[in-house]
């Protein structure tokens, strides 16, 4: 292997360590972002489901009022 001026053969393992650490940081950031999006999607679905339940209750009440007339 040919080294540039001022570069020492012992630097390569340190560079590999830094590259591996960088890869791990990126992987962790991606994983965290995916988990966050997943949680937000789940919360959104729960809110939509809750809203549907409220709408159905409202329709049921309207139907009962209409039947009484």
UniProtKB/Swiss-Prot annotation:
GO terms for biological process: negative regulation of protein-containing complex assembly; protein localization; protein-containing complex assembly. Residues 41-55 have a biased composition (Basic and acidic residues). Changing residue 25 to P: Reduces binding to RII subunits of PKA. One of its GO terms (molecular function) is protein kinase A binding. Preferentially expressed in the neural tissues. Residues 37-69 are annotated as: Disordered. GO terms for cellular component: cytosol. Pfam families: AKAP7_RIRII_bdg (PF10470). Protein kinase A (PKA)-binding protein. Binds to type II regulatory subunits of protein kinase A (PKA) and may block the A-kinase anchoring protein (AKAP)-mediated subcellular localization of PKA. The RII-alpha binding site, predicted to form an amphipathic helix, could participate in protein-protein interactions with a complementary surface on the R-subunit dimer. This is A-kinase anchor protein inhibitor 1. The gene is AKAIN1.
């Amino acid at each position: 292997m040919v080294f540039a001026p001022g570069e020492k053969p012992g630097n390569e393992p340190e560079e590999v360590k830094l590259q591996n650490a960088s890869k791990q940081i990126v992987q962790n950031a991606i994983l965290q972002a995916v988990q966050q999006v997943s949680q937000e999607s789940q919360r959104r679905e729960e809110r939509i489901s809750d809203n549907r339940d409220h709408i159905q209750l409202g329709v049921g009440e309207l139907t009962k009022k209409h039947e009484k007339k």
